[in-house]
């Protein structure tokens, strides 16, 4: 053993002894603590999303904010958000749409999303956290659903803040990460970490919608997959049709 390693080892042992805990006991206690915390997290039972218990909240998918997104191209993000909205509509989920400072700062919702949701009102607000706006909060709570799927720009603010608020209210919050966007890698990584720490469930938009679909024999299946417009799914369908001939 090198001199430095010996001294470090001796120092750790001495520190543990001074605290009245043998080195091995201290390590064992720490591992036990970690195990208990991991087990407590694992005890949360899986309760799937369904058409009856979920709602979709789309936040601040506005032209001005879209231009600053750096973790997805504009085309890819639009594709994902519109696919999420159309699939949710096919699955008959309640959908809440909101913008912030539409006329003074960030502009309107991007046109493709508006076209995908004809007749769905868009609530414009001034609050940063959408859940702080009484009209948005009322629209969400009026659905009677306890599982809330959020997507927004930016990920770490517009999606994260209301999702974490929902968790604080005893609701289950999900964030469709690839239907959200942000302005730097740091914002993305810290935002994801903060949401995980708060108990928000992170996923991608297609997985969330397929979870709700549950059974490919459902009449809505074709509309859901068509809405998500996944190139690989189209390829699989084409191959299946070819082999079926």
Residue locations for each model-derived region?
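A contiguous pocket-lining binding segment that forms or flanks enzyme active sites
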Residues: 147-198
